[in-house]
Amino acid sequence: MTYALEVDGVDKSFGGATILRGVAFAVESGSTTAIVGPSGCGKTTLLRLIAGFEKPDAGTIALAGRVVAGGGWAPAHRRSVGYVAQDGALFPHATVGANVGFGLPRRARTPARIAELLEMVSLDPSYAARRPDQLSGGQQQRVALARALAREPELMLLDEPFSALDAGLRANTRRIVADVLAKAAITTILVTHDQPEALSFADRVAVMRAGRLAQIGTPREIYSTPIDVPTAEFIGDAVVLSAHVDGSRARCALGDVAVAANGVHGNARVMVRPEQIELTPDGAGVSGTVVDVEYLGSEMLLGIRLNTADGMVPERVTVRRFGATTLTPGDRVGIRVLGKAVAYPA
């Protein structure tokens, strides 16, 4: 299979500081991949290497089977790659039309082609006469996308393009951009530090930590079966408890719970998501005491201190509950675990 992008054993350092170490992954044509990780983990550096703005110290990068870095070098303008930066990088004193047209060959910079590109990103062609400061942040990012699309790239790179937008505008702009790229069937890589954004935007998610890729998989795999505890805790709220695993069951502060088969036995740590913990209407299951209630609008997070037995140290867990609740700190509740926990070596 020829992949749209292949990265193999890539290292990169700046001033003696190692930023990327042995990064390797492949991206299928027409797919969307999100690279998610905390600030400073190396994800933007990786994107710049793919774009051709920097050279790797070791390893190779290939686009559609053609090596463009390591064993050969193709500068950015020789790669069929579109790039949208975090701030859009529009020319502030040029019109929207001129900004979009910058991505086109001179002979193709016609009003009709610019109008077509604006319509692709759900902007009225009349916006061509405006300047960037007359647009909202979301509209500016869509203009930046239109400019990148003008080159008809085989690969689109998005470097945290929604991070500067407020929550409502960010979600709407993200949906529009995802729809545009899907209709154009352009292979896309999104870099973000926003976990829900990565999970909702992409077909596959790559979790980056300290210059390495910790795990690559579908959004469901990354969220439901993270490879280790740090990945579990980074990608979403996680309840992690000490446990003893025997076959397909684990004994922990949440009681006797089912675990996904992954070869872990004996002393271990188990992870469940807050939404897997259910309050029992009759108080059955493990008992606990509500210690705090966090209101988040459509959902609530309940902090519950478990009333453990068998000499186990009391544990505090978080329970996600949708809708309103009458529970207050001090109330006693019963809880049980739905589905399977994931076990990790102690």
From Swiss-Prot:
UniProt KW keywords: ATP-binding, Cell membrane, Ion transport, Iron, Iron transport, Membrane, Nucleotide-binding, Translocase, Transport
Record-listed E.C. numbers: 7.2.2.7
One matching Pfam family: ABC_tran
An example Gene Ontology CC term for this record: ATP-binding cassette (ABC) transporter complex
Membrane topology value: Peripheral membrane protein
One of the record's GO molecular function terms: ATP hydrolysis activity
Transmembrane domains' residue ranges: none
Classification via SMART domains: AAA
Keyword Membrane part of the UniProt annotation: yes
Annotated catalysed reactions: Fe(3+)(out) + ATP + H2O = Fe(3+)(in) + ADP + phosphate + H(+)
Residues holding ATP: G37, P38, S39, G40, C41, G42, K43, T44
Protein localization: Cell membrane
Domain ABC transporter, chain residue ranges per copy: 5-235
Enzymatic class: translocase
CDD domains from the UniProt entry: ABC_Carb_Solutes_like
InterPro entries: AAA+_ATPase, ABC_SmlMolc_Importer, ABC_transporter-like_ATP-bd, ABC_transporter-like_CS, ABC_transpr_FbpC, Mo/tungstate-bd_C_term_dom, P-loop_NTPase, Transp-assoc_OB_typ2
Self-association and partners: The complex is composed of two ATP-binding proteins (FbpC), two transmembrane proteins (FbpB) and a solute-binding protein (FbpA).
Role, per record: Part of the ABC transporter complex FbpABC involved in Fe(3+) ions import. Responsible for energy coupling to the transport system.
Family membership noted in the UniProt record: Belongs to the ABC transporter superfamily. Fe(3+) ion importer (TC 3.A.1.10) family.
PANTHER family with a match to the protein in the record: SPERMIDINE/PUTRESCINE IMPORT ATP-BINDING PROTEIN POTA (PTHR42781), SPERMIDINE_PUTRESCINE IMPORT ATP-BINDING PROTEIN POTA (PTHR42781:SF4)
Name under which the protein is recorded: Fe(3+) ions import ATP-binding protein FbpC 1
Species name: Rhodococcus jostii (strain RHA1)
Lineage: Bacteria, Bacillati, Actinomycetota, Actinomycetes, Mycobacteriales
Gene transcribed to yield this protein: fbpC1
